[in-house]
Amino acid sequence: LLDTATLSSAASLDLSSVSPDVISPGDLPGSVAFGINPRNASAPALPTTFSYDSTNFLGSFSGTIEHTGSVFFNADAVEVGNFTIGFDGNRAGTLGGAASGFFVESTTGIAAILFDIENPSNLVATDSSLTIDANLLVSPEFGQFLVDQALAATNLQGADVGDARVAAVPEPTGLALLALGGLAVLRRR
C-alpha cells in the first residue's frame, strides 16, 4: 500500500498515472503491480538474476529482481519506474535498525534508490515460492532528492510510506524467477 496521502502532504507528490505495462488494479483494490522480468529479458528490459538457497535465504541471496513499468506523479511530470529490488548488506540495520538491506531502485525517471525495505513482517522462502511482505521506508537518497527539489521541507528518510509484497515462483530446475510474480505497490489511505 503506497501511502499517497503522506506522499502528497509531506513530499508534494500526487499520483497521476501509470504506464500501460503496469497492472492496475493489482490483486488488491487501489493497488498497482509490476510483473517480474524473465531471466531472458532483452533490452531495454533488464533480466532478473535473483537466486537463493531456501535454507539460508538472507545468507545466500544474490542478484536482482527486475520489473518494467512506471508510476507518474504531479500531472506526469515526475516518473519513477523500471524498478530493481536488490540487496546490499551495507544498508542492513540503517534507518535506526529498521532497514533489512533490501531496497527498491528506480532505473528510469528519478534514477535512484527510492525505498529501503524494512525488516519483513512475513518472509517465506521455499524451493517453490518466495513471499516477502514489508514496509517501504523512504531511502536517504530519495529523502535528499525530495529536499533538493523543494518537494519536502525536511528529509523524510526512514518515513514509512507504504507496504511492499514480493511474490515469486522459481523455475523448477533452479531458483531463477519467472514472470509469474510481482512487486505490488498499493495505495494506503
Q: What kind of feature is each model-predicted range?
A:
Residues 109, 123, 132, 148, ...:
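N-terminal cationic amphipathic segment used for targeting or macromolecule association
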Residues 23-109:
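Predominantly extracellular/secreted and cell-surface proteins with exposed
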Residues 86, 101-102, 114, 141-144:
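Intrinsic disorder/low-structure terminal segments
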Residues 108-141:
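Contiguous ligand/interfacial binding patches
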Residues 161-183:
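Short, threonine-centered small-residue motifs that mark membrane-proximal processing/anchoring sites
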Residues 1-58, 135-168:
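N-terminal segment immediately downstream of the Sec signal-peptide cleavage site
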Residues 185-189:
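C-terminal membrane-anchoring or membrane-association module
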